[in-house]
Amino acid sequence: MRARMALAYANITIELREILLSDRPDELYTASSKGTVPVLQLPNGSVIDESFDIMKWALEQTKTDWLDINFEDQLLMIKVNDEEFKPWLNKYKYHQRHPERAYEYYQNKCVEILSKYEQTLSNNLFLFGKKPQISDVAILPLVRQFAHVDLTFFMKNLPHLNRWLETWKASTLFQSIMKKYDKWEPGQTPLIVNFNHK
């Protein structure tokens, strides 16, 4: 999601190969031995197989305005999101698989991190001020996942973060990347996509 949003914002056209993680084609492993998505193969043959790195690459091509405010602080926020928040979120989402702790324990661990965003957003439209930055879009997917576990709890306890999330969900940028595509099949006619174009 976040890689596609950056590609859309940067107005970059790609050949899209939509796959199912339950049925990963050999071509995915040919491009990246990790076998995870997203993977971006550049015209020169080099491969970017981390979503944040794809975001950064896309924005550096044409749209650097998401990178111009306290970039090092943004990187730190994204690191916490990806390395600390995500593991707690997975335990919260799938708490039945982690019975060593109560559901509320995992929820509270997530909120410890999200409350910092909540405090910031009580005074700002976005995480680093009045305009979006790469950090907003980088943490968006996991915040959205957290919200959808218990939306009533999220709306009640993190109202500013909820306002921020709803703003993004209503944006044309978010809507532009939510279209569903058919599964890619080897040998098919290439699907050329610019998410920013309707």
Where in this protein do the model-derived segments appear?
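Short, flexible loop/turn segments with low-complexity composition
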Residues: 67-73, 176-185
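A short hydrophobic/aromatic micro-motif that marks alpha-helical segments and, especially, helix-coil
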Residues: 65, 151, 186-187
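Acidic/histidine-enriched, glycine/proline-rich intrinsically disordered or flexible terminal extensions
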Residues: 181-198
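GST-like domain detector, emphasizing the conserved glutathione-binding G-site
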Residues: 1-112, 125
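A generic structural-conservation signal
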Residues: 16, 130, 177-178
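GST-like fold's C-terminal all-alpha helical module
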Residues: 77-170
